[in-house]
């Protein structure tokens, strides 16, 4: 039974293709919570386009 040996580039691309949406999903769900709790009120009230009003 010959063992399949995929190229490391293909393996890395596949793992990135699988993990990247999951990481973005977890970031988009966890980042606003941490921003809301950890940022001081001065930074919260400043108009920052990267902080989305969740």
Curated annotation (Swiss-Prot):
Q: Into which family does the record put it?
A: Belongs to the ATPase protein 8 family.
Q: Using the chain's own numbering, where are the disulfide bonds?
A: none
Instruction: Look up keyword Ribosomal protein and say if it applies.
Output: no
Protein name per UniProt:
ATP synthase F(0) complex subunit 8
Cellular location(s):
Mitochondrion membrane
User: In Gene Ontology terms, what is a biological process of this protein?
Assistant: proton motive force-driven ATP synthesis
Provide a Gene Ontology MF annotation, just one.
Answer: proton transmembrane transporter activity
For the keyword Transferase, the answer is: no
Sorted UniProt keywords: ATP synthesis, CF(0), Hydrogen ion transport, Ion transport, Membrane, Mitochondrion, Transmembrane, Transmembrane helix, Transport
Classification via Pfam families: ATP-synt_8
Its placement in the membrane is given as:
Single-pass membrane protein
**Biological role stated in the UniProt entry:** Subunit 8, of the mitochondrial membrane ATP synthase complex (F(1)F(0) ATP synthase or Complex V) that produces ATP from ADP in the presence of a proton gradient across the membrane which is generated by electron transport complexes of the respiratory chain. ATP synthase complex consist of a soluble F(1) head domain - the catalytic core - and a membrane F(1) domain - the membrane proton channel. These two domains are linked by a central stalk rotating inside the F(1) region and a stationary peripheral stalk.
> What GO terms fall under cellular component here?
mitochondrial membrane; proton-transporting ATP synthase complex
| InterPro entries for the chain | ATP8_metazoa
Q: State the superkingdom.
A: Eukaryota
Could you describe the subunit structure of this protein? Answer: Component of the ATP synthase complex composed at least of ATP5F1A/subunit alpha, ATP5F1B/subunit beta, ATP5MC1/subunit c (homooctomer), MT-ATP6/subunit a, MT-ATP8/subunit 8, ATP5ME/subunit e, ATP5MF/subunit f, ATP5MG/subunit g, ATP5MK/subunit k, ATP5MJ/subunit j, ATP5F1C/subunit gamma, ATP5F1D/subunit delta, ATP5F1E/subunit epsilon, ATP5PF/subunit F6, ATP5PB/subunit b, ATP5PD/subunit d, ATP5PO/subunit OSCP.
Where is the chain membrane-spanning?
13-35
